[in-house]
């Protein structure tokens, strides 16, 4: 397996195949043959990945004028980065290195080349021991010393070692070693330069939040504002609640909105009336707003029942105006944007039917009440049912009809008697 450095960065490959393996030999460890098979002592990939990058100094970002002295064909690494992928792999010198024949000819005792990015060490001291074995004796102490530095410090020290030999924490021996190895890393490229398109990104614009005072709060300031607000809220618990102005502030990270609700107290109003000038200069007091949730204790004994007369609901007196209000009906205006006119007609028809039905019931009820008042037996019976009212009214009508027929017969008899008397009077007048 080819290493990640050789497979993704063709600019780091030397044109001389004899120096290729010697340059990259310290990056491979033969003891890692079983690392991809999940050994018991193996660690997950990526734990000590940065530890390996600390072992060797990072090469310079770009070659200088010394490239022409050591190479007959100067390589412009920026041009190679801009060339298509097919042109990069079409170099015959690179094909020999990436080919199987080139790898077999590098050494008589080939080892399994593994990816340094995804291999791991179970022992933290293993990388230093392997590098000390691979490098010459004069460079072992320098390599181990460089490996113990931080990633940022090691990269800075190695890049600055080509220009300044008096860097803090680096001796003369390290400067001499870097000078000797300068001809080997002329064609090497920093990994950050290889991933230039991925790292070169424009910063995203930070949204701003307009406030009432005219200032804007950015996204970066929002996090600091929330943290400082929490500290201020935790420290404001000891403030007296007598003459303060409570502000409830709610911050939502998704909407970046701030809602402030003002809850003035009676004491604050009194203080404002006494000293109006001090109220303007006083700072806003932010107080934590906690929701009080009361839960019923089922284990507690029940409270004694207290019968209060004032707690009983009073019955509303029945008014006669309610009947008149029910009769008055104001039809609602049709809604704008109705789906169909037929639906509105059906609704209007139902409303008219209901209105007429209510009117009919009210008229019938009033008729029964009037009929009850006409029947002598039901005049004082206000709770008489409709059936009783109809029955008594029918009987009363029959009696009235019988009395009427009797009166008619009597009237007829009286009329006949009247006629007889008139004839007698005429006879006495002629005599």
Curated annotation (Swiss-Prot):
One of its GO terms (cellular component) is nucleus. GO terms for biological process: apoptotic process. SMART domains: HLH. Pfam families: HLH, Myc_N. Residues 400-421 are annotated as: Leucine-zipper. The keyword DNA-binding applies. It comes from the Eukaryota. It is found in: Nucleus. Keywords: Apoptosis, DNA-binding, Nucleus, Phosphoprotein. Residues 348-400 form the bHLH domain. InterPro entries: bHLH_dom, HLH_DNA-bd_sf, Myc_transcription_factors, Tscrpt_reg_Myc, Tscrpt_reg_Myc_N. Transmembrane segments: none annotated. The modification Phosphotyrosine is found at residue 36. One of its GO terms (molecular function) is protein dimerization activity. Has apoptosis-inducing activity. Efficient DNA binding requires dimerization with another bHLH protein. This is Protein S-Myc. The lineage of its organism: Eukaryota, Metazoa, Chordata, Craniata, Vertebrata.
């Amino acid at each position: 397996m080819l290493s990640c450095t050789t497979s993704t960065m063709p600019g780091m490959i030397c044109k001389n195949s004899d120096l290729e393996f010697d340059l990259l030999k310290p990056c491979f460890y033969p003891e890692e043959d079983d690392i991809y098979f999940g050994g018991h002592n193996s660690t997950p990939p990526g734990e000590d990945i940065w530890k390996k990058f600390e072992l060797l100094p990072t090469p310079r970002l770009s070659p200088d004028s010394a490239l022409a002295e050591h190479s007959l064909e100067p390589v412009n690494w920026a041009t190679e980065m801009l060339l298509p992928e097919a042109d990069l792999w079409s170099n015959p010198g690179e094909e020999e290195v990436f080919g199987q024949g080139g790898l077999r000819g590098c050494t008589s005792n080939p080892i399994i080349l593994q990816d340094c990015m995804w291999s791991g060490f179970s022992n933290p001291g293993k990388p230093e021991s392997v590098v000390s074995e691979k490098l010459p004796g004069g460079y072992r102490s320098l390599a181990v010393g460089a490996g113990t530095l931080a990633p940022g410090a090691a990269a800075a020290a190695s890049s600055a070692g080509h220009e300044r030999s008096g860097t803090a924490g680096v001796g003369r021996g390290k400067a001499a070693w870097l000078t000797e190895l300068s001809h080997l890393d002329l064609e090497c490229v920093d990994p950050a330069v290889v991933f230039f398109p991925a790292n070169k990104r424009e910063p995203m614009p930070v949204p701003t939040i307009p406030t009432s005072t005219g200032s804007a709060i950015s996204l970066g300031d929002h996090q600091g504002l929330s943290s400082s607000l929490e500290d201020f809220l935790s420290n404001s618990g000891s403030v007296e609640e007598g003459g303060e102005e409570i502000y409830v502030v709610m911050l939502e990270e998704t909407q970046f909105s701030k809602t402030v609700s003002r809850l003035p107290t009676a004491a604050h109003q009194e203080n404002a009336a006494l000293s109006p000038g001090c109220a303007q200069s006083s700072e806003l007091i932010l107080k934590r707003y906690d929701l009080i949730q009361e839960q019923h204790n089922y284990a507690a004994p029940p409270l004694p029942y207290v019968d209060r007369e004032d707690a009983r609901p009073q019955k509303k007196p029945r008014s006669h105006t309610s009947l008149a209000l029910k009769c008055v009906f104001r039809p609602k205006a049709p809604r704008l944007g109705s789906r169909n006119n037929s639906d509105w007609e059906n609704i209007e028809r139902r409303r008219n039917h209901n209105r007429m039905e209510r009117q009919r019931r009210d008229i019938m009820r009033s008729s029964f009440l009037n009929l009850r008042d006409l029947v002598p037996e039901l005049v004082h019976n206000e709770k008489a049912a409709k059936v009783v009212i109809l029955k008594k009214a029918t009987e009363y009508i029959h009696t009235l009809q019988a009395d009427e027929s009797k009166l008619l017969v009597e009237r007829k008899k009286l009329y006949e008697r009247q006629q007889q008397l008139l004839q007698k009077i005429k006879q006495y007048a002629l005599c």
